[in-house]
Every structure is written in C-alpha cells, then in structure tokens.
C-alpha cells in the first residue's frame, strides 16, 4: 500500500501544479454529477479522491450547513490545497482524511458517494466494496471521468487520451468503459456521455 500511495503522490504532484482555471470546462459536468446524487439539505456525502476540493462549493450548496461532507484524498499536496479551500470558505461541516479509500476504517453511512476523475478507484474492487459498505441502502454513487470513444471521429482523440490515462492513473484497465467494475457492485441507473463521448457520468445505486 505504501508503494501504491507513493506512486499516487508522484502522479498527483503533476495534477496539483495545473492551474485550476484549466479545468473550467468541467464545472457544468461537476454540477450535473452532483445533481445526480439526489442529495438535499442535511444529507451526508463522501467525496472519494476529493483532490483540491473543487467539488466542495457545489456539494455545500446542496447539503447546506446541516449536511456533512467527508473528503478522502491520498495525496498530501492535493489535500493541503483542499484544507486551504475549506479554511478560506469557513466551512465547518467538511472533514478531510489523508488516506486511500481502501485504508478508510468503517465509518458512518453516507447518503451518497462522488468519485470525480478517480480511474484507479473505478478499477479497485477493494475500494468499491469499501464504498458500498459505507453508503446507505438506496444511496447513489456517481462516477465521472474520461473514456476512450469507441465510435466515430472521436476515436481520433484516443492517442491523446491514452497519454492522459498514463500520466494521471496507475490502472490502465477499462479505459473504454471505466464504470465496468462499478456496475458489478451497484445497480446501474444511467450512463451519460458528455463532450462527444470523451467524458462519462455513471449513476448507480446501492
């Protein structure tokens, strides 16, 4: 596990240095994904691989001050930025844990789970089983990330996407259908394609 975390930190050092405005195109997708969680005021949600906390403002808008948000992030660089974001905004209902999801102890059960650009977790049976164990019956899991298009002119993007996967993920499995293993652990409700099939939103339910 320590070697795995070291490799994750190495990859995420690169991501942490990317200016956040370059990910501006994901804001609409992020909002749509959070809407798909079907949360409400007072809900609890776990943000698996929360990174710098880019989803926190949108989650806060949904769950409110009476709700709770737990951010799980193995990268020290990323979670330090998430802490700065939380402190700057004055959010009191967000907790952060510097661990992989596989390392997280049994904790309270959540009303939803968000996984944004977490290809390694999408392909971790242990990680997905842990998520399943800590969400409530009927809770939604929403996964978002890039995928390799399997038809049309969009396939021309595949060489570049393959380089992206190699740079940002350890696992290189299921790049055409990153939700494949998730769908074995949860009931699939919908799979939405964005950006001409380059990005997916998977909505599942326990």
Regions found by a protein language model. Give the residues of each.
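Helix-to-beta-strand junctions that scaffold the AdoMet/dcAdoMet cofactor pocket
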Residues: 64, 122-123, 135-136
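A short SAM/SAH-binding and catalytic strip from SAM-dependent methyltransferases
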Residues: 112-125
């Amino acid at each position: 596990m320590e070697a795995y975390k070291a490799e994750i930190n190495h990859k995420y050092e690169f991501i942490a240095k990317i200016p956040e405005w370059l990910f501006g195109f994901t804001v609409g997708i992020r909002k749509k994904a959070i809407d798909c969680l079907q949360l409400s005021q007072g809900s609890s949600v776990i943000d698996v691989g929360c990174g710098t906390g880019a989803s926190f403002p949108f989650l806060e808008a949904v769950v409110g001050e009476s709700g709770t948000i737990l951010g799980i992030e193995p990268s020290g660089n990323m979670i330090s930025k998430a802490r700065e974001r939380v402190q700057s905004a004055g959010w009191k209902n967000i907790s952060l844990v510097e661990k992989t999801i596989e390392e997280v102890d049994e904790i309270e059960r959540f009303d939803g789970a968000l996984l944004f650009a977490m290809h390694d977790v999408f392909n971790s049976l242990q990680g997905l089983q842990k998520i399943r164990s800590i969400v409530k019956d009927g809770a939604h899991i929403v996964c978002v990330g890039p995928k390799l298009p399997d038809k049309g002119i969009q396939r021309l993007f595949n060489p570049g996407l393959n380089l992206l996967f190699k740079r940002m993920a350890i696992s290189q499995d299921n790049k055409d259908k990153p939700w494949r293993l998730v769908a074995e652990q949860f009931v699939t409700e919908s799979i939405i394609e964005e950006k001409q099939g380059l990005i997916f939103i998977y909505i599942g339910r326990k």
